[in-house]
């Protein structure tokens, strides 16, 4: 059982676009209220290979066996800016992606009001944020993960499946709670 908190939404309510495109139907998820204690659907996280602000390549498949905190944000987004110190602290607290948790930011250069890759990298450096932020230059990841608002954070379990998401800013305490919840749910 996922045991979703009030902060972490089930994946079935926001299945990434790659899972529903062309099906003709909206995906549905069983909930406890629908039919007792049924399990939410297992939805593989869309894989990607993108480059971060340091020029390093990141592929989701490279992190198999680790919990992933995937945060979609924008430099112009006030709530995003508000939670970034807590994301940096989470990144440092869990060993800078060397342990069981991988923290990745996702920025979409040129989308809407967003600046260039260089401007995003400068923003990160000037503010002391060292957690890797991959550049979704073709917006494929933003589309595949169904991003409708910033910030949005997806939790991906060690099996590479979507565990849940939060479509708003979080405190550091909530971030740690959803990370622990995702880790505890793994076999």
Regions flagged by a language model, labelled:
Residues 64, 72-89:
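Conserved redox-active cysteine motifs that mediate thiol-disulfide chemistry
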Residues 118-159:
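Short, internal strand/loop/helix patches
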Residues 18, 155-187:
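Thiol-/selenol-based redox modules, centered on thioredoxin-like
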Residues 98-115, 129-138:
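Thiol-based oxidoreductase modules, predominantly thioredoxin-like and allied folds used
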Residues 1-44, 187:
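N-terminal targeting signals for export/organelle localization
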Residues 40-42, 47-68, 91-95:
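A short beta-strand-turn-helix
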Residues 1-14, 68, 72-73, 79, ...:
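Gram-positive cell-envelope targeting signals
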